[in-house]
Structures are given as structure tokens and as C-alpha cells.
């Protein structure tokens, strides 16, 4: 879970997005926050939407 959070934070920062910007139209800000901190695993649907917004392959998070 922590590795997923680290990778998500890396790709988000690489795109120059804040947590709130990434969460927009995808999920709650708190979901992004908890995932990046290794406290929560999001549903696959949300992970897919995050990857689409970041323009990265789904496998990049694992």
C-alpha cells in the first residue's frame, strides 16, 4: 500500500498537480491523501480514473 502511495505521489508531482487537482472529478481529496499516505487502497475504478487523469498506464502504479 505504501509503495502505491509513493508512486502515485511521484506521478502526480511530475504532472504538476496538487492532491485537490488530481481528485477533481475523480474522487474525494481525502481519498488521494489517504492513498498517498499508505492508509487506504482505492477501488480499481478510482485507480483507473486516476491513471487516465495522470496519463499513465495502470501498471505504473504497481
Where on the chain are the PLM-derived regions?
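Short alpha-helical DNA-recognition segment
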Residues: 16-34
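A short, Lys/Arg-rich alpha-helix, primarily the initiator
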Residues: 1-14
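Short, conserved catalytic or interaction motifs in soluble domains
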Residues: 37
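DNA major-groove recognition helix of helix-turn-helix/homeodomain DNA-binding modules
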Residues: 45-60
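Short amphipathic recognition helices of helix-turn-helix/homeodomain-type DNA-binding modules
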Residues: 25, 60-62
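Alpha-helical residues within helix-turn-helix
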Residues: 10, 20-21, 49
Amino acid at each position: 500500500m505504501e509503495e502505491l502511495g509513493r508512486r502515485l505521489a511521484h506521478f502526480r508531482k511530475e504532472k504538476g498537480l496538487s492532491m485537490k487537482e488530481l481528485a477533481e472529478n475523480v474522487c474525494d481529496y481525502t481519498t488521494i491523501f489517504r492513498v498517498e499516505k499508505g492508509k487506504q487502497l482505492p477501488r480499481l475504478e478510482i485507480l483507473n480514473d486516476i491513471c487516465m487523469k495522470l496519463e499513465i498506464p495502470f501498471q505504473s502504479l504497481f
